[in-house]
From Swiss-Prot:
Transmembrane domains' residue ranges: 4-24
Species name: Methanocaldococcus jannaschii (strain ATCC 43067 / DSM 2661 / JAL-1 / JCM 10045 / NBRC 100440)
Superkingdom, natural source: Archaea
Keywords: Membrane, Transmembrane, Transmembrane helix
Cellular component terms per the entry's GO annotation: membrane
Membrane topology summary: Single-pass membrane protein
Family: To M.jannaschii MJ1394 and A.fulgidus AF2028.
Subcellular location: Membrane
Subcellular location, principal: membrane
UniProt-recorded name of the protein: Uncharacterized protein MJ1393
Protein backbone atom coordinates (compact mmCIF):
# COMPACT_ATOMS: atom_id res chain seq x y z
CA UNK A 1 0.00 0.00 0.00
CA UNK A 2 2.84 2.41 0.84
CA UNK A 3 4.36 1.77 -2.58
CA UNK A 4 1.03 2.47 -4.26
CA UNK A 5 0.72 5.73 -2.37
CA UNK A 6 4.24 6.63 -3.45
CA UNK A 7 3.48 5.94 -7.11
CA UNK A 8 0.25 7.92 -6.92
CA UNK A 9 2.20 10.85 -5.51
CA UNK A 10 4.74 10.60 -8.30
CA UNK A 11 1.98 10.72 -10.87
CA UNK A 12 0.61 13.85 -9.24
CA UNK A 13 3.93 15.59 -9.86
CA UNK A 14 3.49 15.73 -13.63
CA UNK A 15 3.59 19.28 -14.92
CA UNK A 16 0.84 20.81 -17.00
CA UNK A 17 2.43 22.30 -20.10
CA UNK A 18 2.06 25.91 -21.08
CA UNK A 19 0.22 26.39 -24.36
CA UNK A 20 1.57 28.53 -27.20
CA UNK A 21 -0.38 29.55 -30.32
CA UNK A 22 -3.15 27.62 -31.99
CA UNK A 23 -5.91 26.52 -29.61
CA UNK A 24 -5.78 25.79 -25.94
CA UNK A 25 -7.89 22.66 -25.52
CA UNK A 26 -6.75 20.12 -28.11
CA UNK A 27 -7.77 17.51 -28.95
CA UNK A 28 -4.71 17.34 -31.26
CA UNK A 29 -1.68 18.05 -29.08
CA UNK A 30 1.67 18.75 -30.71
CA UNK A 31 4.36 19.24 -28.09
CA UNK A 32 8.06 19.95 -28.37
CA UNK A 33 10.17 19.18 -25.30
CA UNK A 34 13.84 19.57 -24.60
CA UNK A 35 14.68 17.18 -21.79
CA UNK A 36 17.85 17.54 -19.74
CA UNK A 37 19.82 14.62 -18.30
CA UNK A 38 21.98 16.17 -15.57
CA UNK A 39 24.71 14.84 -13.29
CA UNK A 40 27.35 16.38 -11.07
CA UNK A 41 29.08 16.37 -7.71
CA UNK A 42 30.30 18.67 -4.98
CA UNK A 43 33.49 18.90 -2.98
CA UNK A 44 31.51 19.48 0.17
CA UNK A 45 31.34 23.27 0.10
CA UNK A 46 27.61 23.16 -0.61
CA UNK A 47 27.63 24.10 -4.28
CA UNK A 48 26.48 21.23 -6.48
CA UNK A 49 28.63 21.42 -9.61
CA UNK A 50 26.23 19.95 -12.15
CA UNK A 51 26.92 18.89 -15.71
CA UNK A 52 24.56 18.27 -18.61
CA UNK A 53 25.12 14.72 -19.80
CA UNK A 54 22.70 15.06 -22.70
CA UNK A 55 19.79 17.06 -24.08
CA UNK A 56 17.17 15.26 -26.13
CA UNK A 57 14.49 16.86 -28.24
CA UNK A 58 11.10 15.13 -28.35
CA UNK A 59 8.24 15.98 -30.70
CA UNK A 60 5.01 14.41 -29.46
CA UNK A 61 1.97 14.30 -31.77
CA UNK A 62 -0.99 13.07 -29.73
CA UNK A 63 -4.58 12.57 -30.91
CA UNK A 64 -6.77 12.70 -27.79
CA UNK A 65 -10.05 12.43 -29.70
CA UNK A 66 -12.78 10.49 -27.91
CA UNK A 67 -14.11 8.09 -30.57
CA UNK A 68 -12.94 6.24 -33.65
CA UNK A 69 -14.62 8.97 -35.71
CA UNK A 70 -11.84 11.26 -34.45
CA UNK A 71 -9.20 9.34 -36.41
CA UNK A 72 -6.97 11.81 -38.26
CA UNK A 73 -5.48 11.31 -41.70
CA UNK A 74 -2.58 12.77 -43.63
CA UNK A 75 -1.04 14.52 -40.63
CA UNK A 76 1.93 16.75 -41.49
CA UNK A 77 4.07 18.64 -38.97
CA UNK A 78 6.61 21.17 -40.24
CA UNK A 79 9.63 21.58 -37.96
CA UNK A 80 12.84 23.58 -38.18
CA UNK A 81 15.33 21.55 -36.15
CA UNK A 82 18.39 23.45 -34.93
CA UNK A 83 21.60 22.57 -33.08
CA UNK A 84 20.97 18.84 -33.31
CA UNK A 85 23.79 16.29 -33.34
CA UNK A 86 21.67 13.39 -34.58
CA UNK A 87 18.92 13.29 -37.15
CA UNK A 88 15.28 12.91 -36.16
CA UNK A 89 14.07 9.34 -35.74
CA UNK A 90 10.76 7.70 -34.92
CA UNK A 91 11.01 6.86 -31.21
CA UNK A 92 7.42 5.70 -30.61
CA UNK A 93 4.87 4.82 -33.29
CA UNK A 94 1.45 4.22 -31.79
CA UNK A 95 -0.28 4.08 -35.17
CA UNK A 96 -1.16 1.02 -37.29
CA UNK A 97 0.91 2.29 -40.22
CA UNK A 98 4.30 3.87 -40.83
CA UNK A 99 5.58 7.29 -39.83
CA UNK A 100 7.88 9.13 -42.22
CA UNK A 101 10.48 11.88 -41.93
CA UNK A 102 10.44 13.96 -45.12
CA UNK A 103 12.31 16.96 -46.51
CA UNK A 104 9.23 18.52 -48.13
CA UNK A 105 5.45 18.52 -47.88
CA UNK A 106 2.73 18.56 -50.56
CA UNK A 107 1.55 21.97 -51.73
CA UNK A 108 -2.02 21.33 -50.60
CA UNK A 109 -0.90 21.40 -46.96
CA UNK A 110 0.10 25.05 -47.38
CA UNK A 111 2.75 24.54 -44.71
CA UNK A 112 5.61 27.03 -44.32
CA UNK A 113 9.19 26.25 -45.24
CA UNK A 114 11.02 23.97 -42.80
CA UNK A 115 13.97 21.58 -42.83
CA UNK A 116 11.95 18.63 -41.53
CA UNK A 117 8.42 17.37 -42.14
CA UNK A 118 6.81 14.55 -40.16
CA UNK A 119 4.16 12.64 -42.11
CA UNK A 120 1.65 10.39 -40.31
CA UNK A 121 -0.77 8.82 -42.82
CA UNK A 122 -3.21 7.72 -40.10
CA UNK A 123 -3.40 8.78 -36.45
CA UNK A 124 -6.25 7.03 -34.62
CA UNK A 125 -7.87 8.54 -31.57
CA UNK A 126 -5.96 7.92 -28.34
CA UNK A 127 -2.73 7.27 -30.20
CA UNK A 128 0.49 9.22 -30.48
CA UNK A 129 3.84 9.41 -32.22
CA UNK A 130 7.14 10.55 -30.70
CA UNK A 131 10.09 11.77 -32.75
CA UNK A 132 13.40 12.30 -30.99
CA UNK A 133 16.86 13.66 -31.74
CA UNK A 134 19.95 14.56 -29.75
CA UNK A 135 20.81 18.21 -29.23
CA UNK A 136 24.28 19.70 -28.86
CA UNK A 137 24.58 20.04 -25.08
CA UNK A 138 27.23 22.76 -25.40
CA UNK A 139 24.62 25.33 -26.47
CA UNK A 140 23.48 25.92 -22.90
CA UNK A 141 24.19 25.30 -19.24
CA UNK A 142 22.36 23.65 -16.36
CA UNK A 143 19.15 25.65 -15.77
CA UNK A 144 19.30 25.39 -11.97
CA UNK A 145 21.95 26.34 -9.44
CA UNK A 146 21.64 24.17 -6.33
CA UNK A 147 23.46 24.95 -3.12
CA UNK A 148 23.14 22.56 -0.18
CA UNK A 149 24.85 22.96 3.19
CA UNK A 150 24.54 21.34 6.62
CA UNK A 151 24.36 22.50 10.19
CA UNK A 152 26.83 19.86 11.43
CA UNK A 153 29.93 18.43 9.83
CA UNK A 154 29.84 15.14 11.75
CA UNK A 155 27.38 13.03 13.68
CA UNK A 156 28.16 10.20 16.15
CA UNK A 157 26.83 6.67 15.72
CA UNK A 158 24.59 4.68 18.11
CA UNK A 159 22.70 7.71 19.34
CA UNK A 160 20.03 10.02 18.03
CA UNK A 161 21.58 12.88 16.14
CA UNK A 162 20.00 15.98 14.66
CA UNK A 163 21.16 17.94 11.66
CA UNK A 164 19.63 20.51 9.36
CA UNK A 165 19.85 20.65 5.59
CA UNK A 166 19.81 24.12 4.01
CA UNK A 167 18.86 24.04 0.34
CA UNK A 168 18.83 26.99 -2.05
CA UNK A 169 17.68 26.69 -5.67
CA UNK A 170 18.18 29.59 -8.07
CA UNK A 171 17.98 30.14 -11.82
CA UNK A 172 20.98 29.99 -14.08
CA UNK A 173 19.80 32.91 -16.20
CA UNK A 174 22.30 32.29 -18.99
CA UNK A 175 20.79 28.83 -19.53
CA UNK A 176 17.21 30.06 -19.92
CA UNK A 177 15.40 31.27 -23.06
CA UNK A 178 15.07 34.78 -21.58
CA UNK A 179 16.37 36.58 -18.51
CA UNK A 180 12.87 36.83 -17.09
CA UNK A 181 11.93 33.18 -17.69
CA UNK A 182 10.43 31.70 -14.51
CA UNK A 183 11.21 28.09 -13.59
CA UNK A 184 8.76 25.76 -11.86
CA UNK A 185 10.33 23.33 -9.41
CA UNK A 186 9.07 20.33 -7.47
CA UNK A 187 11.29 18.44 -5.04
CA UNK A 188 10.61 15.09 -3.42
CA UNK A 189 13.04 14.14 -0.67
CA UNK A 190 13.35 10.60 0.65
CA UNK A 191 15.18 9.31 3.71
CA UNK A 192 16.33 5.78 3.04
CA UNK A 193 17.93 2.74 4.64
CA UNK A 194 17.50 0.76 1.42
CA UNK A 195 20.87 0.12 -0.27
CA UNK A 196 19.08 -0.13 -3.61
CA UNK A 197 17.71 3.37 -3.18
CA UNK A 198 20.63 5.47 -1.94
CA UNK A 199 20.41 4.35 1.69
CA UNK A 200 22.40 2.33 4.22
CA UNK A 201 20.78 -0.55 6.11
CA UNK A 202 22.54 0.45 9.34
CA UNK A 203 20.03 3.24 9.92
CA UNK A 204 17.40 2.15 12.45
CA UNK A 205 15.83 5.59 12.83
CA UNK A 206 15.31 8.30 10.25
CA UNK A 207 12.74 11.05 10.54
CA UNK A 208 12.07 14.52 9.17
CA UNK A 209 11.08 16.52 12.22
CA UNK A 210 10.19 19.71 10.40
CA UNK A 211 10.71 21.84 7.33
CA UNK A 212 10.31 25.53 6.50
CA UNK A 213 10.36 27.03 2.99
CA UNK A 214 10.10 30.56 1.66
CA UNK A 215 7.24 29.55 -0.66
CA UNK A 216 5.14 26.65 -1.85
CA UNK A 217 3.60 23.79 0.08
CA UNK A 218 5.41 21.13 2.10
CA UNK A 219 3.94 17.72 2.79
CA UNK A 220 5.59 15.22 5.13
CA UNK A 221 4.64 11.62 4.51
CA UNK A 222 5.55 8.00 5.14
CA UNK A 223 7.72 7.10 2.19
CA UNK A 224 8.71 3.78 0.64
CA UNK A 225 12.40 3.55 1.57
CA UNK A 226 12.33 3.37 5.39
CA UNK A 227 10.23 1.64 8.03
CA UNK A 228 6.48 2.31 8.20
CA UNK A 229 5.17 4.93 10.58
CA UNK A 230 7.81 7.63 10.10
CA UNK A 231 7.75 11.02 8.40
CA UNK A 232 10.67 9.96 6.25
CA UNK A 233 9.71 11.71 3.02
CA UNK A 234 8.89 15.24 1.97
CA UNK A 235 7.26 16.78 -1.09
CA UNK A 236 7.76 20.46 -1.86
CA UNK A 237 5.41 21.79 -4.52
CA UNK A 238 4.14 25.10 -5.86
CA UNK A 239 7.65 26.53 -6.20
CA UNK A 240 8.37 29.12 -8.87
CA UNK A 241 11.71 30.91 -9.01
CA UNK A 242 12.00 34.10 -11.04
CA UNK A 243 13.82 37.42 -11.27
CA UNK A 244 12.84 38.44 -7.74
CA UNK A 245 13.16 35.28 -5.67
CA UNK A 246 14.98 31.99 -5.21
CA UNK A 247 13.59 28.90 -3.50
CA UNK A 248 14.95 28.04 -0.06
CA UNK A 249 14.04 25.28 2.35
CA UNK A 250 15.40 24.13 5.71
CA UNK A 251 14.84 20.47 6.56
CA UNK A 252 15.47 19.13 10.08
CA UNK A 253 16.47 15.47 10.28
CA UNK A 254 16.88 13.07 13.18
CA UNK A 255 18.70 9.78 12.68
CA UNK A 256 20.39 6.92 14.47
CA UNK A 257 22.99 4.69 12.88
CA UNK A 258 24.08 1.37 14.41
CA UNK A 259 27.58 1.37 12.94
CA UNK A 260 30.07 0.35 15.70
CA UNK A 261 33.55 0.28 14.12
CA UNK A 262 35.89 3.00 15.35
CA UNK A 263 37.01 3.65 11.81
CA UNK A 264 34.87 5.52 9.38
CA UNK A 265 32.20 4.81 6.83
CA UNK A 266 30.30 6.63 4.12
CA UNK A 267 26.60 6.38 4.90
CA UNK A 268 23.94 7.26 2.39
CA UNK A 269 20.81 8.40 4.18
CA UNK A 270 18.55 9.34 1.29
CA UNK A 271 18.14 11.46 -1.79
CA UNK A 272 16.14 14.26 -3.37
CA UNK A 273 14.48 14.10 -6.78
CA UNK A 274 14.35 17.42 -8.63
CA UNK A 275 11.64 18.16 -11.19
CA UNK A 276 11.93 21.38 -13.17
CA UNK A 277 10.14 23.00 -16.07
CA UNK A 278 10.20 26.28 -17.94
CA UNK A 279 8.55 27.69 -21.01
CA UNK A 280 10.58 27.81 -24.19
CA UNK A 281 13.65 25.96 -25.35
CA UNK A 282 17.29 26.81 -26.08
CA UNK A 283 18.17 24.94 -29.27
CA UNK A 284 16.13 27.15 -31.59
CA UNK A 285 14.05 24.20 -32.79
CA UNK A 286 10.55 25.35 -33.69
CA UNK A 287 7.31 23.78 -34.89
CA UNK A 288 6.36 25.92 -37.88
CA UNK A 289 2.98 24.52 -38.83
CA UNK A 290 0.56 21.60 -38.66
CA UNK A 291 -1.80 20.12 -41.22
CA UNK A 292 -4.25 17.27 -40.62
CA UNK A 293 -7.53 16.12 -42.02
CA UNK A 294 -10.13 13.84 -40.52
CA UNK A 295 -13.34 11.91 -40.98
CA UNK A 296 -15.46 13.94 -43.35
CA UNK A 297 -17.70 13.14 -46.28
CA UNK A 298 -18.22 14.77 -49.67
CA UNK A 299 -21.16 14.04 -51.95
CA UNK A 300 -22.01 15.19 -55.48
CA UNK A 301 -25.60 15.68 -56.63
CA UNK A 302 -26.86 15.71 -60.23
CA UNK A 303 -30.35 16.78 -61.27
CA UNK A 304 -31.83 16.62 -64.79
CA UNK A 305 -32.17 16.72 -67.62
CA UNK A 306 -34.54 19.64 -67.87
CA UNK A 307 -36.01 21.22 -71.00
CA UNK A 308 -33.99 23.96 -72.63
CA UNK A 309 -36.65 26.33 -74.01
CA UNK A 310 -34.17 27.80 -76.48
CA UNK A 311 -33.21 24.52 -78.13
CA UNK A 312 -36.25 22.46 -77.32
CA UNK A 313 -33.96 19.71 -75.94
CA UNK A 314 -33.74 18.15 -72.50
CA UNK A 315 -30.16 19.20 -71.90
CA UNK A 316 -30.09 21.40 -68.80
CA UNK A 317 -28.46 19.81 -65.73
CA UNK A 318 -27.86 21.00 -62.16
CA UNK A 319 -24.91 20.04 -59.96
CA UNK A 320 -24.14 20.66 -56.29
CA UNK A 321 -21.98 19.28 -53.47
CA UNK A 322 -22.31 18.63 -49.75
CA UNK A 323 -19.43 18.33 -47.27
CA UNK A 324 -20.14 16.83 -43.85
CA UNK A 325 -18.08 16.62 -40.63
CA UNK A 326 -18.42 13.11 -39.21
CA UNK A 327 -15.90 13.56 -36.39
CA UNK A 328 -16.94 13.56 -32.72
CA UNK A 329 -14.43 16.05 -31.31
CA UNK A 330 -12.85 17.94 -34.18
CA UNK A 331 -13.88 21.09 -36.02
CA UNK A 332 -12.79 21.27 -39.65
CA UNK A 333 -11.86 24.31 -41.70
CA UNK A 334 -13.32 23.77 -45.19
CA UNK A 335 -10.94 25.63 -47.48
CA UNK A 336 -11.70 24.48 -51.04
CA UNK A 337 -14.51 22.77 -52.98
CA UNK A 338 -14.55 21.85 -56.67
CA UNK A 339 -17.52 20.52 -58.67
CA UNK A 340 -17.31 19.43 -62.32
CA UNK A 341 -18.91 17.12 -64.85
CA UNK A 342 -17.46 14.94 -67.58
CA UNK A 343 -18.93 13.12 -70.55
CA UNK A 344 -20.04 9.71 -69.34
CA UNK A 345 -21.39 8.42 -72.62
CA UNK A 346 -18.63 5.81 -72.84
CA UNK A 347 -17.92 4.24 -69.42
CA UNK A 348 -14.87 2.45 -70.79
CA UNK A 349 -12.89 5.67 -71.17
CA UNK A 350 -14.42 7.56 -68.23
CA UNK A 351 -11.74 9.66 -66.53
CA UNK A 352 -12.68 12.60 -64.28
CA UNK A 353 -9.31 14.25 -64.89
CA UNK A 354 -9.32 13.96 -68.69
CA UNK A 355 -9.84 17.55 -69.81
CA UNK A 356 -11.11 16.38 -73.21
CA UNK A 357 -14.11 14.88 -71.41
CA UNK A 358 -14.79 17.98 -69.29
CA UNK A 359 -18.19 19.47 -70.05
CA UNK A 360 -17.93 23.22 -70.75
CA UNK A 361 -19.12 25.56 -67.99
CA UNK A 362 -19.51 22.68 -65.52
CA UNK A 363 -16.39 23.25 -63.42
CA UNK A 364 -17.09 25.40 -60.37
CA UNK A 365 -14.67 26.18 -57.54
CA UNK A 366 -15.21 27.94 -54.25
CA UNK A 367 -13.20 28.73 -51.11
CA UNK A 368 -15.71 28.63 -48.26
CA UNK A 369 -13.17 28.97 -45.40
CA UNK A 370 -15.98 27.82 -43.19
CA UNK A 371 -15.64 26.04 -39.87
CA UNK A 372 -17.65 22.81 -39.72
CA UNK A 373 -18.57 21.68 -36.23
CA UNK A 374 -18.96 17.95 -35.47
CA UNK A 375 -22.04 16.63 -37.26
CA UNK A 376 -22.60 19.72 -39.41
CA UNK A 377 -23.00 19.83 -43.21
CA UNK A 378 -21.96 22.49 -45.73
CA UNK A 379 -23.93 22.73 -48.99
CA UNK A 380 -22.77 24.43 -52.15
CA UNK A 381 -24.74 26.58 -54.53
CA UNK A 382 -26.67 24.69 -57.20
CA UNK A 383 -24.94 25.25 -60.56
CA UNK A 384 -26.46 24.75 -64.04
CA UNK A 385 -24.77 23.55 -67.22
CA UNK A 386 -25.93 22.38 -70.64
CA UNK A 387 -25.05 18.97 -72.07
CA UNK A 388 -26.89 16.84 -74.61
CA UNK A 389 -25.73 13.48 -73.29
CA UNK A 390 -24.96 11.62 -70.07
CA UNK A 391 -22.90 13.72 -67.63
CA UNK A 392 -21.07 12.33 -64.61
CA UNK A 393 -20.77 14.88 -61.79
CA UNK A 394 -17.73 14.87 -59.54
CA UNK A 395 -16.86 16.81 -56.38
CA UNK A 396 -13.81 17.02 -54.17
CA UNK A 397 -12.85 19.20 -51.26
CA UNK A 398 -9.97 20.22 -49.04
CA UNK A 399 -10.48 20.58 -45.32
CA UNK A 400 -8.18 20.45 -42.34
CA UNK A 401 -8.40 20.31 -38.58
CA UNK A 402 -9.22 23.81 -37.35
CA UNK A 403 -6.35 25.63 -35.66
CA UNK A 404 -8.50 26.00 -32.55
CA UNK A 405 -8.37 22.21 -32.15
CA UNK A 406 -4.56 22.07 -32.18
CA UNK A 407 -2.72 22.65 -28.92
CA UNK A 408 0.97 23.48 -29.34
CA UNK A 409 3.31 23.10 -26.35
CA UNK A 410 6.93 24.25 -26.19
CA UNK A 411 8.89 23.68 -23.00
CA UNK A 412 12.02 22.40 -21.30
CA UNK A 413 11.93 19.81 -18.56
CA UNK A 414 14.02 17.29 -16.67
CA UNK A 415 14.62 13.94 -18.35
CA UNK A 416 12.15 11.26 -17.24
CA UNK A 417 13.14 8.36 -14.99
CA UNK A 418 10.90 5.31 -14.77
CA UNK A 419 11.91 4.74 -11.15
CA UNK A 420 11.84 8.21 -9.60
CA UNK A 421 10.03 10.32 -12.17
CA UNK A 422 13.08 12.50 -12.84
CA UNK A 423 16.68 11.60 -13.59
CA UNK A 424 17.90 14.64 -11.64
CA UNK A 425 18.72 13.00 -8.31
CA UNK A 426 20.69 14.51 -5.44
CA UNK A 427 22.14 11.70 -3.31
CA UNK A 428 22.85 12.68 0.28
CA UNK A 429 25.48 10.94 2.37
CA UNK A 430 26.98 11.23 5.81
CA UNK A 431 30.62 10.86 4.87
CA UNK A 432 33.27 9.53 7.31
CA UNK A 433 36.85 9.04 6.31
CA UNK A 434 38.05 5.67 7.60
CA UNK A 435 41.54 4.44 8.45
CA UNK A 436 41.86 2.89 5.02
CA UNK A 437 39.40 2.91 2.15
CA UNK A 438 39.64 0.80 -0.98
CA UNK A 439 38.17 2.05 -4.24
CA UNK A 440 37.82 -0.22 -7.25
CA UNK A 441 37.22 1.09 -10.78
CA UNK A 442 36.73 -1.23 -13.70
CA UNK A 443 37.44 -0.17 -17.28
CA UNK A 444 36.33 -1.97 -20.44
CA UNK A 445 38.35 -0.97 -23.48
CA UNK A 446 36.98 -2.41 -26.75
CA UNK A 447 39.63 -3.35 -29.28
CA UNK A 448 39.35 -3.36 -33.06
CA UNK A 449 39.41 -7.18 -33.23
CA UNK A 450 36.31 -7.51 -31.05
CA UNK A 451 38.16 -8.37 -27.84
CA UNK A 452 38.21 -6.27 -24.68
CA UNK A 453 41.05 -5.12 -22.46
CA UNK A 454 39.89 -5.22 -18.84
CA UNK A 455 41.62 -3.01 -16.26
CA UNK A 456 40.68 -3.34 -12.57
CA UNK A 457 42.18 -0.37 -10.72
CA UNK A 458 42.47 -0.91 -6.95
CA UNK A 459 43.26 2.28 -4.99
CA UNK A 460 43.64 3.07 -1.31
CA UNK A 461 42.09 6.52 -1.03
CA UNK A 462 42.22 6.44 2.77
CA UNK A 463 44.87 7.67 5.20
CA UNK A 464 46.30 4.37 6.55
CA UNK A 465 47.93 1.39 4.86
CA UNK A 466 45.69 -1.64 4.44
CA UNK A 467 46.49 -4.99 6.08
CA UNK A 468 48.15 -7.71 4.03
CA UNK A 469 46.01 -9.85 1.76
CA UNK A 470 43.61 -7.55 0.02
CA UNK A 471 41.44 -9.89 -2.03
CA UNK A 472 39.94 -8.84 -5.36
CA UNK A 473 37.32 -11.01 -7.07
CA UNK A 474 35.84 -11.12 -10.55
CA UNK A 475 33.36 -13.34 -12.39
CA UNK A 476 33.52 -14.32 -16.06
CA UNK A 477 30.30 -15.19 -17.89
CA UNK A 478 29.86 -18.21 -20.09
CA UNK A 479 31.17 -18.22 -23.66
CA UNK A 480 34.08 -15.94 -22.75
CA UNK A 481 37.78 -16.78 -22.50
CA UNK A 482 40.50 -15.00 -20.52
CA UNK A 483 44.10 -14.35 -21.61
CA UNK A 484 47.03 -11.94 -21.12
CA UNK A 485 46.74 -11.68 -17.33
CA UNK A 486 49.15 -9.42 -15.46
CA UNK A 487 49.39 -7.19 -12.38
CA UNK A 488 51.13 -3.81 -12.28
CA UNK A 489 53.26 -3.87 -10.36
CA UNK A 490 53.87 -7.61 -10.08
CA UNK A 491 55.56 -7.38 -6.67
CA UNK A 492 52.16 -6.50 -5.17
CA UNK A 493 50.70 -9.88 -6.14
CA UNK A 494 50.80 -12.56 -3.42
CA UNK A 495 48.72 -15.20 -5.16
CA UNK A 496 45.99 -15.69 -7.71
CA UNK A 497 43.59 -18.40 -8.77
CA UNK A 498 40.27 -19.36 -10.20
CA UNK A 499 37.60 -22.01 -10.01
CA UNK A 500 34.66 -23.14 -12.08
CA UNK A 501 31.17 -21.94 -11.11
CA UNK A 502 28.29 -24.39 -11.37
CA UNK A 503 25.68 -22.63 -9.24
CA UNK A 504 24.83 -19.82 -11.64
CA UNK A 505 23.86 -20.52 -15.26
CA UNK A 506 25.19 -17.16 -16.46
CA UNK A 507 28.77 -17.53 -15.16
CA UNK A 508 31.39 -20.24 -15.54
CA UNK A 509 34.54 -18.90 -13.86
CA UNK A 510 35.44 -17.10 -10.63
CA UNK A 511 38.82 -15.34 -10.53
CA UNK A 512 40.67 -13.93 -7.50
CA UNK A 513 43.86 -12.04 -6.71
CA UNK A 514 45.51 -11.63 -3.28
CA UNK A 515 47.46 -8.36 -2.96
CA UNK A 516 50.03 -7.06 -0.51
CA UNK A 517 49.15 -4.10 1.71
CA UNK A 518 48.25 -1.02 -0.34
CA UNK A 519 49.61 2.33 0.80
CA UNK A 520 47.31 5.32 1.36
CA UNK A 521 47.02 8.55 -0.59
CA UNK A 522 45.64 7.54 -4.00
CA UNK A 523 43.59 10.25 -5.68
CA UNK A 524 40.76 7.89 -6.62
CA UNK A 525 40.61 8.86 -10.29
CA UNK A 526 40.65 5.24 -11.49
CA UNK A 527 43.60 5.86 -13.86
CA UNK A 528 45.36 2.61 -14.81
CA UNK A 529 48.36 4.57 -16.15
CA UNK A 530 49.13 6.56 -12.99
CA UNK A 531 52.80 5.54 -12.79
CA UNK A 532 53.55 7.56 -9.64
CA UNK A 533 50.77 5.92 -7.63
CA UNK A 534 51.57 2.46 -8.98
CA UNK A 535 55.28 2.74 -8.07
CA UNK A 536 54.31 4.04 -4.62
CA UNK A 537 52.04 1.00 -4.11
CA UNK A 538 49.03 3.26 -3.67
CA UNK A 539 47.38 1.82 -6.76
CA UNK A 540 47.42 -1.72 -8.13
CA UNK A 541 46.25 -2.48 -11.67
CA UNK A 542 44.96 -5.93 -12.64
CA UNK A 543 44.66 -6.63 -16.37
CA UNK A 544 43.29 -9.39 -18.54
CA UNK A 545 41.92 -9.71 -22.05
CA UNK A 546 38.37 -10.94 -22.54
CA UNK A 547 37.18 -12.60 -25.74
CA UNK A 548 33.68 -13.87 -26.41
CA UNK A 549 31.11 -14.62 -29.04
CA UNK A 550 27.55 -13.44 -29.44
CA UNK A 551 26.02 -10.37 -27.90
CA UNK A 552 28.00 -8.69 -25.14
CA UNK A 553 26.23 -7.74 -21.89
CA UNK A 554 28.27 -5.51 -19.54
CA UNK A 555 25.81 -5.99 -16.69
CA UNK A 556 26.27 -9.79 -16.91
CA UNK A 557 29.95 -9.94 -17.71
CA UNK A 558 31.43 -7.72 -15.05
CA UNK A 559 31.20 -8.07 -11.30
CA UNK A 560 33.94 -7.16 -8.89
CA UNK A 561 34.45 -7.72 -5.17
CA UNK A 562 36.80 -6.86 -2.31
CA UNK A 563 37.41 -9.08 0.71
CA UNK A 564 35.41 -7.35 3.50
CA UNK A 565 37.84 -8.59 6.14
CA UNK A 566 40.46 -6.25 4.77
CA UNK A 567 38.26 -3.32 3.86
CA UNK A 568 36.30 -0.81 5.85
CA UNK A 569 32.74 0.20 5.78
CA UNK A 570 32.91 3.86 5.04
CA UNK A 571 31.79 7.01 9.23
CA UNK A 572 30.72 10.84 9.46
CA UNK A 573 30.83 14.19 7.43
CA UNK A 574 28.10 15.43 5.14
CA UNK A 575 28.71 15.15 1.45
CA UNK A 576 26.44 15.36 -1.61
CA UNK A 577 26.76 13.61 -4.92
CA UNK A 578 24.34 14.15 -7.80
CA UNK A 579 23.70 11.47 -10.37
CA UNK A 580 21.41 11.02 -13.38
CA UNK A 581 19.83 8.22 -15.38
CA UNK A 582 22.54 7.57 -17.93
CA UNK A 583 25.53 7.97 -15.65
CA UNK A 584 24.20 6.27 -12.55
CA UNK A 585 23.24 3.18 -14.53
CA UNK A 586 26.33 2.71 -16.67
CA UNK A 587 29.51 4.44 -15.59
CA UNK A 588 29.48 5.52 -11.98
CA UNK A 589 32.39 3.95 -10.05
CA UNK A 590 31.35 2.27 -6.82
CA UNK A 591 33.26 1.67 -3.60
CA UNK A 592 33.35 -2.11 -3.47
CA UNK A 593 33.12 -2.44 0.31
CA UNK A 594 30.19 -4.78 0.87
CA UNK A 595 30.27 -8.21 2.50
CA UNK A 596 29.24 -9.81 -0.80
CA UNK A 597 30.41 -9.27 -4.34
CA UNK A 598 29.44 -5.83 -5.54
CA UNK A 599 28.16 -5.06 -9.04
CA UNK A 600 30.48 -2.40 -10.40
CA UNK A 601 29.61 0.45 -12.75
CA UNK A 602 31.30 -0.14 -16.07
CA UNK A 603 33.50 2.48 -17.72
CA UNK A 604 33.67 1.88 -21.47
CA UNK A 605 36.39 3.70 -23.39
CA UNK A 606 37.30 3.72 -27.05
CA UNK A 607 40.89 3.16 -28.09
CA UNK A 608 42.00 6.35 -29.90
Amino acid sequence: MRKLIFMALLMSLLFIGTVFGYGDNGPLYVAYYEKYNITGNTTGDGLVSSTIESITGYIVINNTGTTINDTLYDVWVAVNISNNITGPEVYVNGTPKGVFIESSAPAYTNLPNANTYIHIPILPNNSYVIIKFAIDKSITGVPLIINETYSDTKIPSERLSNWSVYLNISRNVSALPATDTPVSVIMTKYLSNDPNNYGSDTWNFLNITGAIANEGSITLWDGPYFLPGYNDSLTWTGVVINTTKNATITINITGNNTYTNRTGTLMKYGFAVIFFEFNGTKSGTKIEGIYATGYGGVSATKEGPFLNASSGKYEIWYESANVSNKASSYYFNLTHVTIWAVNGSNPVILDPFNITLLIPNSKQTSSPNEILSPGSVWSSTKYAFTFDGIPVVWANCTFKVADENITLINRSINEYSTKYGSSYVVVEEIYVVGSYLIKVTKHIVPDADGTYDIYIVVENIGSVKTPEYVYVYDLIPKNFTVSDEWVNQSSMLIAEGNHTITTNPRYNLSMWWALHAIYPGADGDGNWNDTAEILANKTVVIHYKLNGTGEFYPSDAFIVGIDPTNSLLPTTSPKITTVAGTVENNSEPFLALLTLLVGLGIIIRRVM
